[in-house]
């Protein structure tokens, strides 16, 4: 797992202090199952982090500390995408990160894929199409490992708001996904959840839990802003097929009650869980649906330990567990 320890207080205005302890819990629940590559800003930053991890009895022998000065900590979107070729070789694909076509502070993050792949000795392939370096964040797609990818029109096709690749069509994206990710089948949902500053990332919305099963969030309150859009996405899934021509199993996941802070609706969603080799970390929100969501996800992953991570403070940064972590295949 690739993580970057936060150092930018502006990502969690007024709530930065508890974020360090949330990250401590995250690392603590990953290291029993796989190594962590932990990106830190400096030698002093690393010392402070090690002190916190030791206080929490985290096995730091399972952590590789890498010094690189990032802008932000959202590894899902700024890290390279890893693929395995037909011979089983792991390669890294570099999709361009531009701050979700919204923020200006991404000039350091754009060099992260090169730093990481040099550090771990993997080949880095720049995703080029029509003489352009394709912009794509890891949180905007989810795959089943067999050739099917799910994404949203809101994120990739909006031609006015947070435009990633001006002029790109569904056909263009299908070509890019096929060439660089081996994708033969693309599922297009419509809109993401309310409060998501990425403008429609699918990892808050709909996730594969195995090659044949999709977990999608559902809002039952007709007065909630998410109600119409989320139910529309569920309707879209009724007619889709996988790469093998079969219909997927669809499981619905509840949404927590609307979570607000400082007059902002936050993108709280149980779908932003993170899968490790032996555990599944699920964001929880002090909500009545926490237990229900943990139960549903536990049934989807019977061989993994499902662990709730308190994310009320974390989501003030407008993302949670899947957003901040990135898997690296062995």
Q: Which role does the model predict for each range below?
A:
Residues 1-330:
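The feature marks the mature, well-folded catalytic cores of soluble enzymes
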């Amino acid at each position: 797992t690739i993580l970057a320890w936060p150092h930018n207080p502006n990502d969690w205005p007024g709530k930065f202090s508890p974020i360090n302890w949330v990250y401590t819990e995250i690392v603590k629940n990953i290291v029993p199952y796989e190594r962590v590559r932990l990106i830190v800003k400096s030698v002093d930053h690393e010392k402070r982090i090690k002190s916190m991890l030791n206080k929490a009895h985290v096995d730091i022998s399972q952590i590789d500390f890498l010094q690189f000065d990032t802008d932000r900590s959202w590894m899902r979107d700024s890290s390279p995408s890893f693929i395995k070729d037909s011979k089983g070789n792991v390669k890294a694909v570099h999709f361009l990160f531009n701050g979700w076509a919204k923020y200006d502070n991404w000039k350091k993050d754009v060099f992260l894929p090169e730093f990481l792949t040099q550090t771990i000795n993997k080949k880095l392939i720049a995703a080029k199409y029509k003489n352009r370096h394709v912009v794509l964040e890891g949180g905007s797609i989810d795959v089943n490992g067999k050739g099917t990818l799910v994404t949203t029109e809101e994120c990739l096709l909006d031609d006015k708001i947070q435009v990633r690749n001006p002029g790109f069509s569904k056909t263009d994206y299908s070509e890019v996904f096929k060439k660089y990710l081996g994708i033969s089948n693309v599922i297009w949902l419509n809109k993401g959840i309310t409060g998501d500053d990425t403008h429609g990332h699918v990892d808050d919305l709909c996730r594969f839990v195995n090659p044949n099963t999709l977990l999608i969030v559902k809002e039952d309150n007709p007065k909630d802003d998410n109600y119409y859009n989320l139910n529309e996405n569920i309707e879209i899934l009724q007619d889709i097929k996988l790469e093998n021509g079969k219909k997927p199993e669809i499981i619905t996941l509840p949404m927590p009650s609307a979570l607000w802070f400082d007059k902002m609706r936050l993108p709280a969603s149980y779908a932003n869980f993170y899968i490790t080799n032996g555990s599944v970390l699920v964001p929880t929100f002090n909500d009545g649906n926490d237990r229900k969501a943990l139960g549903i996800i536990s049934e989807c992953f019977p061989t993994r330990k499902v662990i709730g991570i308190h994310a009320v403070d974390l989501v003030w940064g407008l993302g949670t567990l899947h957003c901040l972590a990135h898997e690296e295949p062995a």
